[in-house]
A protein has these predicted regions:
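A short glycine-rich, hydrophobically flanked beta-strand micro-motif that places a catalytic Asp/Glu
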Residues: 138, 244-261
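C-lobe/activation-segment region of protein kinase-like
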Residues: 288-331
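Catalytic activation segment of kinase domains across protein kinase-like and atypical kinase folds
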Residues: 256-302
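N-terminal mitochondrial targeting presequences
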Residues: 1, 33, 37-55
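A short mid-domain helix/strand-loop element embedded in enzyme catalytic domains
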Residues: 191-223
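Active-site loop/lid in soluble adenylation, ligation, and acyl-transfer enzymes
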Residues: 50, 54-203, 314-368
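A long amphipathic alpha-helix within ATP-dependent nucleotide-binding catalytic cores
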Residues: 221-252
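N-terminal chloroplast transit peptides
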Residues: 1-30
Length: 368
């Protein structure tokens, strides 16, 4: 990952009185679950329709961008354009996992970008963010920030499928992960006694897990900045878990990134609580499936990870099997479903005949 100085477009057990008040004030968007479900039932297309729309758009994915200004940095999913004190993040339909590209997923970029913007607005009472404007479904304009070289991964459950996942570490006998002590006798997908932060470094080749103590010891961050980011990570995550619960969802884990702007303010950057950066499970079936030793009903990219992991070694094999169209459409459908469950809004399918780059350039006029 690049360490350039810009924001890449990509458990608190008790709330304070002000936080509780803020949560109550957002009743129309974050509580009143029964009302939300009734609205959602009327507004959301069924799964078959979502999947059909995705199948029709497989050949019209946003695979790259060309906005024609500033310095361009191409990441795994986002293209970033830096110009002056602002940056533009274009979220594409590229799908990555295991540190490599896997497929293109219809509508993924728009879903991720719009999901992030919804969460940024919902959490700005907890921590400031870098968002300036969202002029296009795939585009966000952000303040330019100096990015802290640490990803703040936060977990509420013992799960995962990658080589660096908490579950992989645990099943291989590890009982300390990034400085967090883990109890014996736990099983996969079990809820942890409390949310934990398990940071990773942001490096060019491979990120690596690191303890909070080593972050300071190795000079990645100053203690004061680290303490602030850890506290905000736990606070935002706990709040988001409560919101997700009112939508029939379990927010399992996620990652947050922070940066410092020109005025010295530490801001939440990149993306927040998206199906790319997070795991979500359906809550109504979790207990029953867990009791039977079954995987939870997943509504994120984890099932795509599992598909590849069952058919190859995605870390070592030079050539990976091609994800079938039905699998790609299913993931797209799940992403859209998650967006609609979280926001209560119907996802608007972008017109496939539109020149995406022209659309984005026009949307940015008057914003930059």
């Amino acid at each position: 990952m690049s360490n350039a100085s810009f924001a890449r477009p990509r458990a608190l057990a008790v709330r304070s009185k002000s936080q509780s008040a803020a949560l109550n004030q957002r009743a129309t968007t974050t509580t009143r679950a029964s009302s939300r479900r009734s609205v959602l039932a009327r507004a959301t297309p069924n799964d078959a329709l979502r999947k059909s729309q995705a199948m029709e758009a497989i050949d019209a994915c946003v695979t790259s961008s060309d906005l024609g200004f500033g310095e361009k940095y191409e990441g795994k999913v986002r293209d970033t354009y830096v110009d002056g004190d602002k940056m533009v993040a274009v979220t594409t339909d590229r799908q990555s996992a295991f540190d490599r590209h896997l497929a293109y997923i219809p509508f993924k970029g728009a879903v991720l970008n719009q999901t992030s913007q919804w969460w940024f607005k919902q959490t700005e009472h907890i921590v400031p963010n870098a968002v300036v404007a969202t002029p296009d479904p795939n585009v966000t304009v952000m303040r330019r920030c100096e990015v802290f070289p640490i990803e703040f991964v936060v977990r509420g459950y013992l799960t995962g499928s990658t080589s660096t996942s908490l579950w992989t570490h645990y099943k291989n006998g590890g009982r300390n992960y990034c400085g967090n002590e883990l109890n014996d006798g736990m099983v996969k997908n079990q809820k942890l006694p409390a949310n934990i932060v398990t940071p990773t470094t942001k490096e060019k080749e491979h990120d690596r897990p690191i303890s909070l103590a080593d972050i300071v010891k190795e000079g990645w961050m100053k203690q004061e900045d680290l303490d602030y980011c850890v506290a905000k990570t736990l606070e935002v995550f706990a709040y988001a878990q409560e919101v997700a619960a009112t939508r029939g969802l379990i927010l399992v884990d996620t990652k947050y990134e922070f940066g410092r702007d020109a005025d010295g303010t530490i801001r939440l950057i990149d993306e927040i609580n998206t199906p790319d950066s997070s795991r979500y499970w359906l809550s109504d079936s979790y207990a029953e499936r867990q009791a039977k030793g079954m995987e939870p009903d997943m509504i994120d990219k984890e099932f795509l990870r599992l598909w590849f992991a069952e058919r190859c070694d995605p870390y070592k094999d030079e050539v990976l099997p091609e994800a079938p169209a039905d699998l790609v459409a299913e993931l797209s459908s799940r992403y859209v479903k998650l967006y609609e469950m979280i926001t209560g809004e119907t996802f608007e399918v972008p017109a496939s005949s539109t020149d995406v780059n022209e659309r984005m350039r026009n949307a940015l006029k008057g914003v930059l």
